[in-house]
Amino acid sequence: MSSEDLSAPGPSAPDSSWSSTGPSTKFELERETELRLEVEGTDPVRVELVSGLAEVFGTELTRNKKYTFPPGSRAAIFTWHGCTVQLWGSPDMAYVSRDTPMLLYLNTQVGLEQMRVQAEREGERGPRVLVAGPSDVGKSTLCRLLLNYAVRRGRRPTLVELDVGQGSVSVPGTMGALCVERPADVEEGFSAQAPLVYHFGSTTPGTNIKLYNKLTSRLAHVFNLRCDSNRRASVSGCLINTCGWVKGSGYQALIHAASAFEVDVVLVLDQERLYNDLLRDLPHFVRTLLLPKSGGASERSKECRRESRDQRVREYFYGPRGSLYPHAFEIKFSEVRVYKVGAPTIPDSCLPLGMSQEDNQLKLVPVTPGRDMAHHLLSVVPLDGGSAEEGIEERSVAGFIVITGVDTERQTLTLLSPAPRPLPKCVLLIMDIRFMDLK
């Protein structure tokens, strides 16, 4: 088995479509309005575009096709010219709003496209855009919208995901990049066939800010190499999604990301103070814009965030529609090497001479297999020569596994894996993230 196999779970089963039953509601949307949906509870909601033109976060809807939004979904169906939408099910919230920032977002896209045209004409690079703002203001949604609009114009932009708590490119606890070649699927998002993913190990950058900044620099370096060899990627530029930590070390991480990627444009959502701070601290040639958040962006509870992270991991193993079948098998303790990136903080007086706490943050600490590893998510980092510990924290991962069981008597681990045994020659990096496989 090659290491690439880990990125694609096993054979798929026929999709079982959900029948259009339950209460039905028809919405007549006027031009430049949007139907906002929030789906909680346990039942999905289905939507169909009956007439007119409409889109979801920049992806055009196909007329007379039913789209399913599962529990936990939040969506906005926007129309530039007016449309009729049929809805089946009982969402927690469904209303039409005229108060939308879509015209401002479209103007932003027009400006970015003008920069791409100029880059094409003058042999320069395209716009590198960093999207910043506190939590729950719609940063990921704005990135998705601008990426979709760029692709619809024939571009091939790169999505750079620095939000370790969300994981739109891969699972939570990772950082990564994805070349976007087609608009996001309304139900499943962007196709992640060959993402570049790095292990971080936690959902909060503050747990290891040294590693976070190092991986940010690594992503920027790899993106620069791609732009050097691919003119279309260079002209198309990138959209960088950041986390909602915008104070203290979080703010410094934003400045570091802007510097590492040499961004041309910074879009700040819904926080004037952050906008003014970045305007002051970034180079004068960086265009910094303040944009309003959508009225549909609302604060999520800790429970909602946890469920969203669980869903992202579940989708990795089982697919967005639950139609994939991962593999379960046992391996012996002696067959694996497990590490954690970053040693526990200890007093400076106890550190070796000349070593700092920051050095400690990048140290690989061996983890002895035991019961406390149960249900942890682990990154699979393939070994292609060299020592096991050499630069492991900067290597891209091949995929992920979950330890579903630990037998200390038999010295075995039971794994949930998207690919069958055996594991490739690899090192496993353990995350703080746990996943209970209840399927």
Swiss-Prot record:
Stored InterPro entries: Clp1, Clp1/Grc3, Clp1_C, Clp1_C_sf, Clp1_N, Clp1_N_sf, CLP1_P, P-loop_NTPase
Xref: Pfam families: Clp1, CLP1_N, CLP1_P
In the UniProt record, what gene is named as encoding this protein? clp1
* BP terms from Gene Ontology: cerebellar cortex development; global gene silencing by mRNA cleavage; mRNA 3'-end processing; RISC complex assembly; tRNA splicing, via endonucleolytic cleavage and ligation
Q: Where is this region: Disordered?
A: 1-29
Top-rank lineage group of the source organism: Eukaryota
List all Polar residues biased stretches.
Answer: 14-24
Q: What protein is this chain from? A: Polyribonucleotide 5'-hydroxyl-kinase Clp1
- The record lists ATP as bound by E34, R74, D136, V137, G138, K139, S140, T141
Record key words, sorted: ATP-binding, Kinase, mRNA processing, Nucleotide-binding, Nucleus, Transferase, tRNA processing
> Which GO-annotated molecular functions does the record name?
ATP binding; ATP-dependent polydeoxyribonucleotide 5'-hydroxyl-kinase activity; ATP-dependent polyribonucleotide 5'-hydroxyl-kinase activity; polynucleotide 5'-hydroxyl-kinase activity
Q: Its family?
A: Belongs to the Clp1 family. Clp1 subfamily.
